[in-house]
Regions:
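Metal-dependent amide/peptide-bond hydrolase catalytic core
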Residues: 85, 89-184
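Amphipathic repeat-derived elements
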Residues: 1, 7, 180-184
Length: 184
């Protein structure tokens, strides 16, 4: 006695900054709301350029990073400021240096989404958005610690305050059921 359900999942992927207005992370929301409770098997169908029964879908997490400093006039009194943009740039460079030590399937992507208000003002606030990826969820957790250390080091060296804004959660890596794989 099995019941077959077809569940559509809009906004199923993590979209940078989307969690602020409720978008993205649809699969995580469905799981948290119990849509898959008492489900024996689950299949995912995703449009692609080719058919694959066992695709590599790695774990991913999205976070935003905020640095808070102290504004100052860049020409007249820069020495009294705490440059939040310097913190972002150092964090970005720390991660760039870390990349040579990462496994090929470990990925870190980031952009600065807010770098300041005016070039003649030392920025007191900056924000960046990051996606962290690894082959398995356990590896993602280890990689996230390394990435957070890059941000902490940048905050420490610039005397800025660091704030980590979590996304909708972690997408764990896809694990294909071997029995279903053979049947499909």
């Amino acid at each position: 006695n099995y019941e077959i359900k077809l569940v559509g999942c809009p906004a199923e992927e993590i979209i940078p900054l989307s969690y602020e207005n409720g978008g993205g992370g649809g699969k995580i929301k469905l799981i948290n709301e119990g849509v898959f409770k008492n489900t024996a098997y689950s299949m995912m169908i995703h449009p692609a350029t080719r058919n694959e029964v066992d695709p590599l879908m790695i774990a991913v997490k999205q976070i935003d990073i905020e640095f808070y400093g102290k504004a100052a006039h860049a020409s007249g009194s820069a020495y009294v400021g705490k440059n939040a943009l310097d913190a972002q740039i150092l964090a970005y460079n720390n991660i760039s240096a870390l990349r040579q030590q990462l496994q090929p399937v470990e990925k870190v992507h980031g952009i600065i989404t807010h770098g300041g208000e005016s070039p003649n003002i030392i920025p007191d606030y900056t924000r960046s958005s990051w996606m962290i990826r690894a082959q398995e969820t356990k590896d993602l957790k280890k990689l996230e610690k390394k990435i957070l250390n890059c941000f902490k080091g940048a905050a420490e060296s610039t005397s800025c305050k660091l704030n980590v804004v979590e996304g909708n959660g972690t997408y764990e890596n896809l694990v294909t059921d071997k029995k279903l794989k053979k049947i499909f």
